[in-house]
């Protein structure tokens, strides 16, 4: 909770400074817009979506993947899964998350939840069937690393910030085009709406690059946490196994791609919009840290 409060306070200060700067520059005289009120409006709507998504993330993940939470283990594999997650959670200093299995042939796993002490860790049936116990443990350790690092909360807050700024500056641009260029004095016209939508599309792409950059950084941190909890050799072996299965069709819903362990097939400019680094880069980072 302290992380959320500090993050919100910091970004509130940034928003206030941005509003004051625009006022001092006299931008409001060109557009006749109250930027303080606009900032508040954009912040409310910008954060609302990302925070609501965060708080219902466990429910959404279960529904979209068909994850079955293990409350009472029915097989020795489920018993091993629960014991392994409990052991890793204890070592990471977090409460035991819910543990589930989702029906997918692809080898994948994800962690989600609004709080590191109220999370969900789930693995695919395909991963359990084809990976060795050490490799499964490494994947679980990677997901526990995400939970312990508070990555889900941080990603939601960053998304809220970029949402706010995209909405804010898109509306400034739209109003500037409408008032200062098209000289419309009769309230928001077609120029305002067209310019705002255009700006939101362009700024949205730039914002996605920022969010995905953070997402890729957190994957490296989660890999490092997985190596610490399960061993560097096991973590590298798990990533190598994932690399060998990259031809298997992805069944993870798009909304959960950023939270899965698998991903990162593109390089170059396309790689800027990927939630995961290429597996080769992740493996090399682990090898470099072990030297």
From Swiss-Prot:
Its main location: membrane. The chain crosses the membrane at residues 4-24, 36-56, 150-170, 193-213. It comes from the Bacteria. The keyword Zinc applies. CDD domains: M48B_HtpX_like (cd07335). InterPro entries: HtpX_protease, Pept_M48_protease_HtpX, Peptidase_M48. One of its GO terms (biological process) is proteolysis. Zn(2+) binds at residues 142, 146, 219. Pfam families: Peptidase_M48. One of its GO terms (molecular function) is metalloendopeptidase activity. It is a multi-pass membrane protein. Signal peptide: none annotated. The active site is at residue 143. One of its GO terms (cellular component) is plasma membrane. The keyword Hydrolase applies. Binds 1 zinc ion per subunit. Its cofactor is Zn(2+). Its EC number is 3.4.24.-. Belongs to the peptidase M48B family. This is Protease HtpX. It comes from Pseudomonas paraeruginosa (strain DSM 24068 / PA7) (Pseudomonas aeruginosa (strain PA7)). The lineage of its organism: Bacteria, Pseudomonadati, Pseudomonadota, Gammaproteobacteria, Pseudomonadales.
